[in-house]
């Protein structure tokens, strides 16, 4: 009897031990699975090998996918390229050339293409083309439209309506829920350039520009008469456009104030871009600069409150040099005191990526050319590294993940890379 009880006890112990081992194995496997899911895939080159590629820009689509556009350079010729990615970051087909005539585009580090996706899935790309004729030269703004998810593009349409040659650039693009397309840019048609004799010896400085706007109500086939929104605008700082769900249009730019103070300004329109509110200076940064910082504002809506957020770089006397954030809850009539996001020198225009649940700032840190990010929805979050050797980043949130496109350099060769950043 005692021997039988001992055998039964040993059997029960073996069962318990097997159960414990199985439970531990399940926990370990689950832990490994969680680690695997949390670890983002490595960065991947998305531009063609051996091609000099730069100026990336991103845009989210309503179905959770996203697009990346960039510019491939070959001496004085350039092409705007577009690639489509699903909500897992997997590329859908080969990149497509946006401009119909090969080599017709132009771009530089401060003025990348503009990109937007409509609620019906139509893809719109804004870009600039250089022209030279009879001793005159300049750049024009064009819009290209695709109705098949970026697989092909119709013939581009010129947006600026002036006839005399001149520079048009630092453009931005936004599409409303009703399909109305807005394009903003800096324009020199009314600018009186100083004569060579009026310039200080050995000193070159761009004249300030006017901010212009045009809109299309027919899918980008035609555009309205060009409308001037502001004068004395910093000539080499990117503009920004944003349309809220209620149709309110916001425009942001860097205004040059008396004394050469260069501060961020925002105006809004409630009637489809016909009339705008008086521009409001977001923050008195006390940044006096005899030159252009090549850094404009980024606009986004707060995912929870719907308020307008502005992200920009400043190096003025009002505080630390760095990246700042401000918020408006009254349609850009007033702004909250600025919040320091990162105290450091920043290159280029920072990106403000907004998703359904969060907003993330992305920027290039000067010096080593490192791309950084900070989740603005997490209390007490700090800046973290996205990638080294990563310049002029563009960020987009898809499927609650942040994807960052950036320029990598190897010797003098540039290429476009895409990485899913953990957050």
What are these regions (language model features)?
Residues 1-36:
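Intrinsic disorder/low-complexity segments
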Residues 33-423:
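Extracellular, repeat-based ectodomains that mediate carbohydrate processing or recognition
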